[in-house]
Amino acid sequence: MVEYAWPEALRPSRLTFYLQHNTTRFVSPVTRATQVLRREGARWVAEASFDPLSPARAGLLEGLLAALAGSLNTVRIWDWRREFRTGDPRVQGDVPSGPFSYSDATIFTDGTGFVVGSGNPALAAGAPRGALAIQTGGWWPNGVAVGAGDLIGLAGRLYIATEKVTASGAGTATIPIAPPLREALLINQPLVLTKPTVAMRLVSDDEAANPTRPGRFTAITIRLEEAL
């Protein structure tokens, strides 16, 4: 299997991009009481339409689709609607690195102290597989770390923040996410916050269908699903 990068020159004119959950629903035939079981296998699903495509851009897309060989290979795409997070664009790496603290870590009598820049956002603690929240650090103190719906890349996988989260004065934030964490991750794993990507494969072998109208403009719609 080969993984391809998505060409920057190709942006969809219409897009569907969402997290498809995997649940089982049981309904009592007597009382209609319902039980729902969450199962593993939630995945990102996308449908992207490119219309119109000039001959050059149509060729670029058709070449990529041919290389993907149906569902065999994968391509890394992102949600074109949400390429950047809505939180405070500053991070602790923007804070001058000092010297701003005492060598013995002394704080003031009112409990305040200095904030020292600590780089870009990353995991502040390890997280187990299946976790629904991650502990992070490196945010701008007391700023909005992420907004609800912001996308986060972690270890090559894509997650969505389910709530708006404000960082603490120390620049830490616990962020609720979906889907559950795909794998256990170690402390200091960096967060991708700009165009976080997900590896996807074509749903079928017919995704390269390319109806063309007079004027040599081509329209192509592709369906993709996350490679789990």
Question: How should these model regions be labeled?
Answer:
Residues 1-228:
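Extracellular/virion structural assembly segments
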